[in-house]
Structures are given as C-alpha cells and as structure tokens.
C-alpha cells in the first residue's frame, strides 16, 4: 500500500480503533506516517521503541501492604482514569517485530484485551505497530501467531512520487529532490 493511501486508511480505522501493523523496508517512513496521522487528527501520540524495552517497562510488581502484589503501571500507558493523557490518541509500538517473544506476549494482551495488567486502555486510543519485513534481514523476528491474528497487517510500498511529496512538504532542497528523481535507484537502495 502506498503512503498516501495508508494514511487515509489509518484515519478511516481510527474511529473503530482497529489494531494494525505496518511492515515495510527499513527507513521507509512507517513511523513517520503514524506520527503525521496523529498530528492531522489532532490526537495524542505515544511511541515506544520496542528493541530498547524490557518486560519490566510494562509494569513492575510491588507489595501494597495487603499481602498481595500489585502492578505499578508505566507512566506512558494511556489507561482509563488518567487526566494527564488525552482521551484519544495513537499508541505506536515501533519496530515491534524486533521485540522478544516475552514482550510480544504482553503486546498481544494490549492488542486483544486493550488492557495492561487488568487496567483498561482509554477507549479513544488506537494501537499501531510498525516493523521491518523479515526478508530485509533488518533484525525482524517472527511475530507470534496469536499476536498476528489480532491485527490487520499493511505493507508499505516505496514509491518515488510519495517520497517526492514528502520531501517537498518537509523542506528538502530541490537539488536533492531532482538528483534522487534522476538517480532513483539510490533512494530505493537506501530504503
């Protein structure tokens, strides 16, 4: 799916909060597209880079004085009842398929049950994951089946016209745009 169509698709899926995953070549703009959609919709945006996270980053057990252990939820999780996080937004798990199997199990619970350790995520939040394709040999692991089955997967296709539009919108110098349009293979070999 091309970038412009993918942006519109995410916008159309936002009202129903369908969990999606975007896969594509390394550096192809997957996360940037999600950021731009959140900005265009005027909603909150939280991004977590999965290769740098541990299971403990999703909550720590602590005794609460009642002979039971409770979870201290992470500051970034948009759970119901929080006033310091917008009511609507996109929670993006970047490079999700570089996460360990244990982290993917936690993510599956967030995607399926829309909660973390029993605390429900705000109803206005959508979960989007991004990641590289295994065929690109960019460190992508196999995604667990029970996680993959709970999301819609879109593959971002790289097109020169999409890149050119992005470059113009982001102030890339015309000489660079002209050079890349002349030597397109250089752009595609980097992405």
Annotate the PLM regions.
Residues 1-182:
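AAA+ P-loop NTPase catalytic core and its hallmark functional loops
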